[in-house]
């Protein structure tokens, strides 16, 4: 990587909201992404255990930061600001990232930039696709929401009323005995199992206004298995019903807002079938569809650094002593003063 140049701004971002401790470093000059280091906690069985995740993060945080600086070819002295995801997410995991960020900020005198994890996923999509004003479907293990920018913030136009889409897929796969691993060769266990399957009666399609619900789908799918339904049929139907419901509420948001751009972001954004459905829907409305770069679909420090860079350039900083975690920090509670700025645009002012 080239050494830091005059007028260049470098931001280090820290992600620690769930299973991944990520450190990213980005620049205002090409190449924009200078480092992308990740340490992922993987359960031996079952789901995420917050305390074990926090212990894992504590062990690997220091080496991850050092590796990112080495990958970028810079020192901490070259970094202009430190950005950190303060929520939403799991408390024990968030505290590790916040502690590391506060320490770096205080020890080295670096401005601290607070970042909302959900905002960062949407901005990762905008920044990697070049879409300035899209409707965004954000689907992950802990989040399912449809948002678009209106009057200074991302507004929620639809969301899950219970569990998230990623949680539905992972929980079903685990209970059905086809995971872990949840993802292999770029395919989720449900997708692999769905090959050769067909529709089976008994799984509800639940869209309530602009919102979706998945807990009933999960219960019905597991019940069908217990009654002897073919596993491939249940996987296929569960996937088709769930994906179609989130695409429908995204379509309603496009129609309501009149916007002509759509994107898909979050961990489930890497799913080929969901991308095909989103692309078809957008095409029917004459909208441009581009999903987030698959390399930034899952949790990562780069998206925190990118969002932190945008926020920092527009004056969003806090005192390290005010860097409190917010486990339930909603995306529509965050002001976005940089919108519709994209990397490569002239700096503000």
From Swiss-Prot:
UniProt keyword annotations, A-Z: Acyltransferase, Cytoplasm, Iron, Metal-binding, Transferase, tRNA processing
Keyword Phosphoprotein annotated: no
PROSITE patterns registered for this protein in UniProt: GLYCOPROTEASE
- Record-level GO cellular component terms: cytoplasm; EKC/KEOPS complex
| GO terms of molecular function | iron ion binding; N(6)-L-threonylcarbamoyladenine synthase activity
Q: Which InterPro entries match?
A: ATPase_NBD (IPR043129), Gcp-like_dom (IPR000905), KAE1/TsaD (IPR017861), Kae1_archaea_euk (IPR034680), Peptidase_M22_CS (IPR017860)
Any matching Pfam family = TsaD
Q: What class of enzyme is it?
A: transferase
Q: Which Gene3D superfamilies match?
A: 3.30.420.40
Q: Known EC number(s)?
A: 2.3.1.234
What this protein needs as a cofactor is:
Fe(2+)
Q: Which reaction does it catalyse?
A: L-threonylcarbamoyladenylate + adenosine(37) in tRNA = N(6)-L-threonylcarbamoyladenosine(37) in tRNA + AMP + H(+)
Free-text comment on the cofactor = Binds 1 Fe(2+) ion per subunit.
A Gene Ontology biological process in which this protein takes part is: tRNA threonylcarbamoyladenosine modification
Positions binding substrate in this chain are 138-142, 170, 191, 271
Task: Spell out the subcellular localization from the entry.
Answer: Cytoplasm
Record: residues binding Fe cation: 117, 121, 138, 299
CDD domains linked to this entry: ASKHA_NBD_Kae1_arch_bac
The entry sums up its family as follows: Belongs to the KAE1 / TsaD family.
Functional note: Required for the formation of a threonylcarbamoyl group on adenosine at position 37 (t(6)A37) in tRNAs that read codons beginning with adenine. Is probably involved in the transfer of the threonylcarbamoyl moiety of threonylcarbamoyl-AMP (TC-AMP) to the N6 group of A37.
User: Under which name does UniProt file this protein?
Assistant: tRNA N6-adenosine threonylcarbamoyltransferase
* Gene from which the chain derives: kae1
């Amino acid at each position: 990587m080239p050494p830091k140049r005059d007028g260049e701004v470098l931001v280090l971002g820290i992600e620690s909201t769930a299973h991944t401790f990520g450190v990213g470093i980005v620049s205002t000059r090409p190449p924009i992404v200078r480092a992308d280091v990740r340490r992922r906690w993987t359960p031996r069985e079952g789901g995420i255990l917050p305390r074990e995740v926090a212990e894992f993060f504590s062990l690997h945080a220091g080496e991850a930061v050092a590796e990112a600086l080495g990958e970028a070819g810079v020192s901490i002295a070259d970094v202009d600001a430190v950005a950190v995801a303060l929520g939403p997410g799991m408390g024990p995991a968030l505290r590790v990232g916040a502690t590391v960020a506060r320490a770096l900020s205080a020890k080295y005198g670096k401005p601290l930039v607070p970042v909302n994890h959900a905002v960062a996923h949407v901005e990762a999509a905008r920044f990697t696709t070049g879409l300035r004003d899209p409707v965004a479907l954000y689907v992950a293990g802990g989040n399912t929401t449809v948002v678009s920018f209106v009057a200074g913030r991302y507004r929620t136009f639809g969301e899950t009323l219970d569990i998230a889409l990623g949680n539905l897929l992972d929980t079903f796969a685990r209970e059905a005995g086809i995971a872990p691993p949840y993802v292999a060769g770029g395919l989720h266990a449900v997708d692999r199992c769905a090959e050769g399957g067909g529709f089976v009666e008994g799984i509800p399609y639940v869209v309530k206004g602009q919102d979706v619900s998945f807990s009933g789908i999960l219960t019905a799918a597991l019940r069908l298995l217990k009654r002897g339904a073919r596993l491939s049929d249940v996987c296929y139907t569960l996937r088709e019903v769930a994906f179609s419901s989130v695409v429908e509420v995204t379509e309603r948001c496009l129609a309501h807002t009149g916007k002509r751009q759509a994107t898909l972001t979050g961990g489930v954004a890497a799913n080929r079938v969901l991308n095909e459905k989103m692309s078809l829907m957008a095409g029917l409305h004459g909208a441009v569809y581009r999903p987030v770069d698959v390399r930034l679909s899952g949790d990562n420090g780069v998206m925190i650094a990118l969002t932190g860079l945008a926020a920092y350039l527009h004056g969003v900083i806090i005192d390290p002593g005010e860097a409190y975690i917010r486990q339930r920090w909603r995306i529509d509670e965050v002001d976005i003063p940089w919108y519709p700025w994209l990397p490569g645009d002239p700096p503000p002012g």
